[in-house]
């Protein structure tokens, strides 16, 4: 699968989700995750859903214990940040080898999730919630 691996030490990728932006670096290592200088478990409050989301692109390619993930992330909440990190890691893996693109794309790790908070409209209480209607 990895026939054209480049001899580079660091692979970069940027991911976005909602208002979160993650700059992800992949370094050959043993599967360590560091987010904003803290361990991945600590930063994500030991939430297995978020941790599995981050590891998903590496697991798709069978490389979960081959690379360390170093991340700078800002904006949004934990779910948005975890998905931004996932997309950034997938993009970094594409930089590692062009052969990685197809399996990552079929799993949906490279596509940006367009869902975001809908804006509030005037005359309404929230984005779609209208004030109580009174017939008389």
Swiss-Prot record:
Annotated TM spans: none
Start and end residues of each stretch annotated as Disordered: 97-136
MF GO annotations: RNA binding; structural constituent of ribosome
PROSITE patterns for the chain: RIBOSOMAL_S9
Name the UniProt record assigns to this protein: Small ribosomal subunit protein uS9
Family designation: Belongs to the universal ribosomal protein uS9 family.
Pfam families attached to this UniProt entry: Ribosomal_S9 (PF00380)
Highest taxon above the source species: Bacteria
Keywords noted in UniProt: Ribonucleoprotein, Ribosomal protein
Gene: rpsI
Biased composition, class Basic residues, residue ranges: 117-136
CC per GO annotation: cytosolic small ribosomal subunit
Gene Ontology annotations of biological process type: translation
InterPro entries on file: Ribosomal_Su5_D2-typ_SF, Ribosomal_uS9, Ribosomal_uS9_bac/plastid, Ribosomal_uS9_CS, Ribsml_uS5_D2-typ_fold_subgr
Basic and acidic residues bias: start-end ranges: 98-116
């Amino acid at each position: 699968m990895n026939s054209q691996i480049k001899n580079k030490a660091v692979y970069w990728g940027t991911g976005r989700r909602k208002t979160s932006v993650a700059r992800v670096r992949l370094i050959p290592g043993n599967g360590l995750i560091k987010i904003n200088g803290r361990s991945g478990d600590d930063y994500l409050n030991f939430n297995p859903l978020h941790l599995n989301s981050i590891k998903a692109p590496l697991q798709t390619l069978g490389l979960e214990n081959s690379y360390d993930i170093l991340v700078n992330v800002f904006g949004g909440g934990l779910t948005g940040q975890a998905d931004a990190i996932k997309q950034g890691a997938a993009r970094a893996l594409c930089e590692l080898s062009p052969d990685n693109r197809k399996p990552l794309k079929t799993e949906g790790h490279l596509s940006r999730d367009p869902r975001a908070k809908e804006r509030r409209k005037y005359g309404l209480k929230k984005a779609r919630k209208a004030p109580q209607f009174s017939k008389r």
